């Protein structure tokens, strides 16, 4: 049995990583000591005559973080039925699977929710004890440990070899580099104001951080943990997706209704792609980004605009959009890139969408204010 992991960012790009074959554990139980009298057979309930073997585990499991209810919804990706709900902690948002598919890493925050323009002085004090990265067992859904990396973590990324975790800490304007074996912070890199999105370039050599208050993306060398470049992109950048060859990065700009394109080799801004609204509808507010496995399409969720946009990266132009749900944020593509899940905050559901027909196939109720989506796929 092997696994393919697809994370989700918001709003981040879906990722396809290494496969593993988990061991099968056998549990043997000892017999009770015998008494002097012959033991009576234990009472049993006969199985129905037509009982068959237990159902196999689902090929696809979908994990959804619910920011307000503080839990994780697990969906059977084969049947689209909710399998379980697991408690996590305060404000779970960003979520990424480990490369081997055994664990999920979830950003937890004790900072009170605050939208743009809200005066922090009017909010209750943050609960710093609630800040951390929760590591969840992907099969049992149990919280294994909480790694305290920084204040108000929002998004994160896992290195392809599963040894490093990169965490954006919004309140301290830092990127924490965590050694996953020990669960300790190796170093913290100062970035810009309000860091949010974290994405590793496909070759693993550079990690990028979007900084909402700074209007820029920061490029950091993963070998030296040194800053390479500050790349101005536009107001309130949220998430980043890369073409499979790592040549171009696409950044959602919430307050500009656009996607910025940058050269990920030269670390320089290239152009803006504007997402147009329709009639009197709200302006698109780009949030999550995913890129098709073949690099043919960039997908963008647009918050209060409720649409999923399609961008042709070869022409740097939008090719259409359709409504997927209320305030879609996180997005994750299924293997093959024909279907996707979006997390819809106000309606407390997840949409399964067909990217070929551009239709919603099903809406699945989850927890309160779903934020991020990640997949683990059993091969």
Where are these regions (language model features)?
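Bacterial N-terminal signal peptides that target proteins for export
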Residues: 6, 11-23
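Predominantly soluble domains enriched in secretory-pathway, periplasmic, or organellar proteins
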Residues: 34-379
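Compositionally biased, low-complexity segments enriched in small residues
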Residues: 4-9, 31, 270
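Bacterial N-terminal signal peptides
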Residues: 21-31
């Amino acid at each position: 049995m092997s696994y393919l992991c697809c994370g989700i960012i918001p709003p981040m790009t879906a990722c396809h990583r290494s496969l593993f074959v988990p061991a099968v554990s056998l549990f043997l139980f000892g017999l009770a000591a015998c008494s002097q009298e012959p033991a009576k057979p234990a009472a049993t309930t006969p199985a129905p005559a037509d009982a068959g073997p237990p159902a196999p585990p689902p090929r696809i499991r979908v994990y959804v973080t619910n920011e307000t209810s503080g839990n994780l919804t697990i969906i059977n990706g084969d049947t689209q039925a909710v399998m379980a709900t697991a408690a996590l902690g305060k404000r779970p948002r960003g979520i990424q699977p480990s490369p081997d598919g055994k664990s999920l890493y979830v950003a937890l925050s004790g900072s009170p929710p605050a939208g743009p323009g809200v005066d922090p002085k009017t909010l209750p004090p943050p609960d710093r004890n609630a800040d951390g990265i929760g590591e969840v067992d992907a099969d049992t859904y149990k919280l294994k440990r909480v790694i305290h990396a920084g204040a108000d973590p929002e998004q994160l990324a896992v290195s392809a070899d599963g040894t490093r975790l990169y965490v954006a800490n919004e309140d301290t304007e830092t990127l924490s580099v965590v050694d996953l074996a020990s669960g300790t912070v190796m170093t913290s890199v100062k970035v810009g104001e309000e860091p949010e999105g974290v994405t590793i370039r496909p070759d693993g050599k550079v990690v990028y951080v979007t900084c909402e208050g700074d209007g820029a993306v920061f490029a950091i060398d993963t070998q030296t943990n040194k800053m390479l470049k500050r790349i101005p992109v536009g107001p309130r950048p949220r998430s980043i997706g890369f073409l499979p060859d790592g040549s171009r990065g696409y950044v959602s700009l919430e307050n500009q209704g656009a996607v910025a394109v940058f050269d990920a080799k030269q670390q320089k801004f290239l152009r803006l792609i504007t997402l147009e609204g329709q009639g009197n509808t709200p302006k698109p507010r780009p949030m999550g980004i995913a890129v098709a496995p073949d690099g043919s399409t960039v997908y963008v969720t647009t918050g209060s605009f409720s649409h999923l946009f399609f961008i042709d990266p070869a022409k740097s132009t939008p090719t259409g959009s359709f409504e997927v749900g209320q305030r879609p944020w996180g997005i994750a593509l299924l293997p093959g890139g024909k279907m996707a899940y979006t997390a819809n905050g106000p309606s407390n559901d997840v949409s399964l969408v067909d990217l070929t027909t551009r239709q919603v196939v099903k809406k699945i109720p989850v927890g309160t204010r779903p934020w991020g989506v990640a997949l683990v796929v059993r091969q």
